[in-house]
Every structure is written in structure tokens, then in C-alpha cells.
From Swiss-Prot:
GO terms for molecular function: transmembrane transporter activity. It holds the Pfam family MFS_1. It is a multi-pass membrane protein. It is found in: Cell inner membrane. It comes from the Bacteria. It comes from Rickettsia felis (strain ATCC VR-1525 / URRWXCal2). InterPro entries: AmpG_permease/AT-1, MFS, MFS_dom, MFS_trans_sf. Keywords: Cell inner membrane, Cell membrane, Membrane, Transmembrane, Transmembrane helix, Transport. The gene is ampG4. This is Putative transporter AmpG 4. GO terms for cellular component: plasma membrane. PANTHER family: MAJOR FACILITATOR SUPERFAMILY DOMAIN-CONTAINING PROTEIN 3, SOLUTE CARRIER FAMILY 33 ACETYL-COA TRANSPORTER -RELATED. Coiled coil: none annotated. Its main location: membrane. The chain crosses the membrane at residues 15-35, 44-63, 84-104, 109-129, 150-170, 177-197, 230-250, 268-288, 295-315, 324-344, 360-379, 389-409.
Length: 414
């Protein structure tokens, strides 16, 4: 079992802890913060503009060479990768403490920029963690190392998702204390990072030749992808496929609060149980793809994930109850995970094996970048359309991807 291997191999334990730290800021930005803002009386249109902090996760590829090559003064003696981890983790402690001192009702702008800073530091931390993991393990053990990192990432998401919401609930809405405790966890993690063993590699000095080589290494996979027929159309299908889900996710937590659900209920059902439904749905999506193939699997899961948004319209007209939220979360998370699994398989199938890593990054980053940009306006749409109208709109958003995929299936082998 994975858990047994983590505690037998200390290197895996290190990656597991780093994975936890990586996963923690993401949920603060994507969900937990929106609950705090909603409870503080902030308008939904303003809340979703905080999604701009997510853009760092989509754009981090552009400063990853800096993390690879720039030595941080003083800290680099601990190790190149560790120096970046220590810097980012330490700064995240300061940002979280600063966030704990803010009151959204009177200092929303400060909180906005602190959230953007947290997103940037977190995404940079992710770059260094991935690099450290790749450096520490050989090719044969990369799979188990990646699985360990993902497992840790999920635990981190639970800590700042379900854990933070439940903590805020039992402390009587004390969000300031909640963020201080999260900051303390990061401070402890920073101390742990200092003890992590880093495999120091001989690094080539950066010169004009290496820079040119790197540019070609980035450009060639892009050129290869866009040389293919219907490349832009394929890219549009990938972008639209999860757009409706992204819009729904941006407003889900404030929606639950508006319906009258407590933070404790959201923590247990939407976050903790929701993760289980997501994992089961991901497994089911893999089975569907295996049984019916890439294209049919993508269409089936695409239709399923869009139609499940009707569950939120139903939820909007139910009195707050444990059972109603459980049903809606089960349906939505299960179908969304099926769709996500199908999309990963489809993107992987599109990539030229020669440039698989870069082309996969191009397609997945394009999707997340567009999704994170558009979700900024989700709150305004809720105010314009009302909740029912908004959920219908998220269902309609899936249609372009499905029509494009059907069109492509007739024209090319996708």
C-alpha cells in the first residue's frame, strides 16, 4: 500500500509532507476564502474577482526557468531547490499572518492583493517541489513519488478546506484565529523543509547557447501542435469542456452559505465527503474511457457533467438539509471527476509522443488559464441571471465543446 511505502522510505515521506504544503494554499484561494468573504457580507460579484489569484497556477511555466537557474543569496547554501521552498514557505507564513489581521468589510483591497501574493508564492512553491521530486527519484520510482505527492496534495486540500471551515465554525466564526493556525502549520513546514535531503546536481551555467536551446525546446512542440489540421478547433474543445464546471466551482461555497448551510456542514459534506465522491468518479471515468474509447467516453462524460448542474437548481429550491446537500454533491462531484479523467485521457491522446510533456502542458494550461480568467465574472452573472439562470448558463457552456468534438470526429481522428 502507498501509506506503508511512505513510512518505509523517508524520501517518500519528505515528498508526502511537501505535497501537503503544496495543496494547502490552493483551497484557501479557490474556496475557503470565498466563505469568509460571503459571511462578511461581500457581494458575490466581488468574491469571484478573487479568482485572479488562480492565474499564477496557469502561468507558472513562464517563471519556472528562474526557479531552475537563479540562486537565492544566503539561502542557496541549504540547497538550490530547498532555498526556493524555504523562501516561498516563509513568505507564505507572513502573507497568512497578514491575512489574519484583515477585516474584509473594511480592508478588502489589502486582502485582495494578499490573496494574489499567496497564489504567486504557492505556484512557485509547486515548481520547486516538482523539481525536487524529479531530482530525488530515478525514472523507475517517479510514478510512486508522483502518487505520493498527489496523496499529500489531497490531504493538504482537506486541511485548508474541510479543516479550516470546521475550525472557523467551532471557534465562533473566528477567521483570524483560523488563518493564524494555518500560518503556524506553514511555519512548522518551513522548519521541516530545512531538514529535507536534496540531491545536488551539477548544473550547467546559463549562457546564450543554453537560452537559445531552451527557447527552441519550448517553441518546437507548439509549432508541431499547431501544424496539425484543426489545431485551434481542438484547443477550443479542450477549453470549453470544463468551462461550465469551472464557473460553477467559483460560486459553489458562497451558494451553500446563502442557502443557509453552516461551515461545519460544508466542511463535512462538500469538502470531506466530496473528495470521496470525486475519487470514485475519477475511477469511474477511467472505466468509461476504457470501455467505449476516448471520443465516446469524452462525449458521455461531457453530457453527464453538464446535466448534473440541474442538481444545483433542485438544491436551490430545497430547505437546507444534510440529505439534499449530500445528493447534490454526490451527483456533481462524481460526474465532474468523470469528465476530468476523460479530458486528461483525451489530451494525452492528442500529444505527439516526441513532445508529450510540453504539448500536454500547452493544452491543460490553456484550459485552466481560460477557465480561471472567465470565472472572475461568475459573480456578476449570478447577480444578472439569478442562481437558477446561472446554473442553466453553466449547462449551456458545455454545448460548444460537445458540438466541436462531434464535428472533429467527422473530420479527423481525435
Amino acid at each position: 500500500m502507498l501509506i506503508t511505502k511512505i513510512f518505509k522510505d523517508y524520501r517518500l515521506f519528505e515528498i508526502f509532507i511537501l505535497g501537503i504544503v503544496s495543496g494547502m494554499p490552493l483551497v484557501i484561494i479557490f474556496s475557503t476564502l470565498s466563505v469568509w468573504l460571503k459571511e462578511s457580507g461581500i457581494d458575490i460579484a466581488v468574491i469571484t474577482t478573487f479568482a485572479v489569484a488562480r492565474l499564477s497556477y496557469s502561468l507558472k511555466v513562464f517563471w519556472s526557468p528562474l526557479v531552475d537557474n537563479f540562486k537565492i543569496p544566503f539561502l542557496s547554501r541549504w540547497g538550490h531547490r530547498k532555498s526556493w521552498l524555504i523562501l516561498c514557505s516563509s513568505l507564505m507564513v507572513l502573507v497568512l499572518i497578514a491575512m489574519s489581521k484583515e477585516n474584509p468589510e473594511v480592508s478588502l483591497t489589502s486582502l485582495y492583493f494578499l490573496t494574489i501574493a499567496l497564489g504567486f508564492l504557492s505556484s512557485t512553491f509547486d515548481i520547486a517541489v516538482d523539481a525536487l521530486r524529479i531530482d530525488k527519484f530515478d525514472q523507475e520510482t517517479q510514478t510512486i513519488a508522483s502518487a505520493t505527492a498527489v496523496f499529500g496534495y489531497r490531504i493538504g486540500m482537506l486541511i485548508t478546506g474541510a479543516g479550516a471551515l470546521y475550525l472557523a465554525e467551532i471557534t465562533g466564526n473566528n477567521w483570524q484565529l483560523t488563518f493564524v493556525i494555518i500560518a503556524i502549520i506553514f511555519a512548522v513546514a518551513t522548519i521541516f523543509i530545512i531538514t529535507v535531503n536534496e540531491k545536488e546536481l551539477v548544473r550547467e551555467k546559463v549562457n546564450i547557447t543554453s537560452i537559445i536551446s531552451w527557447i527552441y525546446a519550448v517553441i518546437n512542440p507548439f509549432k508541431d501542435f499547431f501544424k496539425r489540421e484543426f489545431a485551434v478547433t481542438i484547443l477550443l474543445a479542450v477549453i470549453f469542456f470544463k468551462l461550465g464546471d469551472a464557473m460553477l466551482g467559483a460560486v459553489a461555497s458562497p451558494f451553500y452559505i446563502e442557502l443557509g448551510y453552516t461551515k461545519g456542514e460544508i466542511a463535512i459534506i462538500a469538502k470531506l465527503y466530496g473528495l470521496i465522491a470525486t475519487l470514485v468518479g475519477g475511477f469511474a471515468g477511467g472505466i468509461v474511457m476504457y470501455k467505449v474509447g476516448n471520443f465516446k467516453g469524452l462525449i458521455i462524460t461531457g453530457i453527464a457533467q453538464s446535466l448534473t448542474h440541474f442538481a444545483f437548481i433542485w438544491l436551490n429550491h430545497q430547505p437546507p438539509s444534510f440529505e439534499a446537500l449530500l445528493i447534490a454533491i454526490t451527483i456533481e462531484n462524481f460526474a465532474a471527476a468523470m469528465g476530468a479523467t476523460a479530458l486528461v485521457g483525451y489530451i494525452g491522446n492528442l500529444c505527439n509522443k516526441k513532445y508529450s510533456a510540453t504539448q500536454y502542458a500547452l493544452l491543460s494550461s490553456s484550459s485552466s488559464l481560460c477557465n480561471n480568467t472567465v470565472t472572475i465574472y461568475a459573480g456578476k452573472l449570478v447577480n444578472m441571471m439569478g442562481w437558477d439562470g446561472f446554473f442553466i448558463f453553466t449547462i449551456i457552456l458545455a454545448l460548444p465543446a460537445l458540438f466541436i468534438l462531434m464535428y472533429l470526429n467527422k473530420k479527423v481522428n481525435v
